[in-house]
Amino acid sequence: MMTENGQVDGIGGQVPQLPHPEQNLAMYRALSTTIRAGIVRTAHDCSEGGLAVALAEMCIGGRMGASVDIDGTGSGDVWGRLWGESLGRFVVAVSQDHESAFLAGMKGFPTTVLGTVDDAGSLRITDGDDPLVNVEVEAMTEAWKGTLDMTGGTI
């Protein structure tokens, strides 16, 4: 919570630490190699809003839906796994034909297959059997393009 004078209580207030920058650099170089090889269709980092926002922006940009299961993405709480902005995380879309090549190119780095892209028109996120998010891509697009109505009603 942020109080009126800007003092932070609770979540936040600490600069993220990168304990092994050389590992992150090697991972980014491996990702760059797979991109240059034409293996990756698209990639998005999780630095501005975490996994959930990266997935939403990818669905909006491609006008595609996705079915994602975050089970296996860590032992932290769901909110941290969805919206955590920890360093060195990104979402990558590859065709099924290139999945093995991508995983081989990223060998030695933590990689989790989250789900599939589809034309269902919605982003669906689960944590195992627990549904977390089910939102239409068109609704996300309108919210992203639109403005907030701060008047409390129509003008």
Q: Residue ranges of each PLM-predicted region?
A:
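Intein/HINT protein-splicing elements and their conserved insertion hotspots or analogous self-processing inserts
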Residues: 1-86, 96-155
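Short hydrophobic/aromatic beta-strand micro-patches
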Residues: 91-95
